[in-house]
Amino acid sequence: MADKLTEEQISEFKEAFSLFDKDGDGTITTKELGTVMRSLGQNPTEAELQDMINEIDTDGNGTIDFPEFLTLMARKLKDTDTEEELIEAFRVFDRDGDGYISADELRHVMTNLGEKLTNEEVDEMIREADIDGDGQINYEEFVKMMIAK
């Protein structure tokens, strides 16, 4: 399944993997997974984190390596996000709950993920998704952006 990914997708997933792999050792542990999820406003229990790791950990060593991560991401792409998942993702970004993702909200979430973006990069991301030109991203624009990926 992972062999059906484009080079661009693999490159993007490598970047995402490195956000999780905080110590850069090539594996994601439950501790690293928990850190990223908490930075996104989730609060998983140790058991939930272990379940997530076990679901992806095909070689049974207790951690996720990049090939296992790619398999998961390929599966996620194939399953295309359900509306519920999209709403949940939108809420992570829309911190004040006003129905719009502002540049500040986008910058905050990306910084929590360890992505240090310049103001120009944040503005560019907003511009790319902002169909109606109001300077922020509404739910409809967010869905179009996520489906287009």
UniProtKB/Swiss-Prot annotation:
Domain EF-hand: start-end pairs: 8-43, 44-79, 81-116, 117-149
Function statement: Calmodulin mediates the control of a large number of enzymes, ion channels and other proteins by Ca(2+). Among the enzymes to be stimulated by the calmodulin-Ca(2+) complex are a number of protein kinases and phosphatases.
Cystine residue pairs: none
One Gene Ontology term of the molecular function aspect: enzyme regulator activity
Residues where Ca(2+) 2 binds: D57, D59, N61, T63, E68
Alphabetized SUPFAM superfamilies for the sequence: EF-hand
Domain of life: Eukaryota
Classification of source organism: Eukaryota, Sar, Alveolata, Apicomplexa, Aconoidasida
Entry binding sites for Ca(2+) 3: D94, D96, D98, Y100, E105
Residues binding Ca(2+) 1, per UniProt: D21, D23, D25, T27, E32
Cell division listed as a keyword: no
InterPro entries xrefs: CALM/Myosin/TropC-like, EF-hand-dom_pair, EF_Hand_1_Ca_BS, EF_hand_dom
Name recorded for this polypeptide: Calmodulin
Miscellaneous remark of the record: Calmodulin is not involved in the mechanism of chloroquine resistance.
